[in-house]
Amino acid sequence: TAEKIGDKKLAQAFSGEDAVDINETQHFEKYDVTLMGIASGEDIAECVTEKNGEILNDRTYIVTAVSRTDGTPMPENAADEAYGDMRFFVSPLIQGCNPALVNVISMDGVYTEFIQDDVLYRLTECSNIEIFADRTVYLCVSDGDLYNEEAYNYDESTGEITRAEDYKGVNALFELPLDPALADPEAAEEYLAPLTGEEEEASDEDAYLLGSKEADAFMEKVTPDNIDQYAERIEDSVQTFGADE
């Protein structure tokens, strides 16, 4: 697949000992979905992806294949009525992360695809997922252009992601065989913070704590003898209560 798109360096990476060949297929009513393999690392491809002028060089590359169960060719021409059905969302998903927030889109993902021998091949790339190797890392392939919450279930208590068995369509879900020794929990948490909102929540909490400290410091300066220096008595708001009230 990498050779087909003209990236010889990436093709060599997929042939190397660090690449993982999987070739697992899941079957659906209209389509068969195959996870072919994964390669990850720094500077393993000739074609580079940029974000805000910065080259993203530490990447994961995933190859998938989709074919029709009845053996008919995948449509190549936009004029074909079935061409509009050939929309698939391919994304790694991370255990413990809401997949609606953390997926290939938020992970700086891009893809290239082509049809060969009646099969749709897609090369998906995103940020290197090996830092999450101490968790279960999934790959979803579903119909549509975006993550479909109806196609999968996310258990917030366990962080597990599963297929919605009653979903009528394509909702393949593979577990990626990553080496736990490659995990980097500290880097993973740092990477996830802006994606999951934890960074913003932390900033809000810091602001709240700072405000509380400033309020405490102010109140420590106020005494019954000097309160008139800091506050103005408003007669209309004064209420007097006796022991009988």
Model feature map: region roles:
Residues 11-245:
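Polar, acidic low-complexity tracts enriched in Ser/Thr/Gln/Glu with frequent Gly/Pro and Thr-Pro motifs
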Residues 1-9:
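Single-pass transmembrane signal-anchor helices and their membrane-water interface zones
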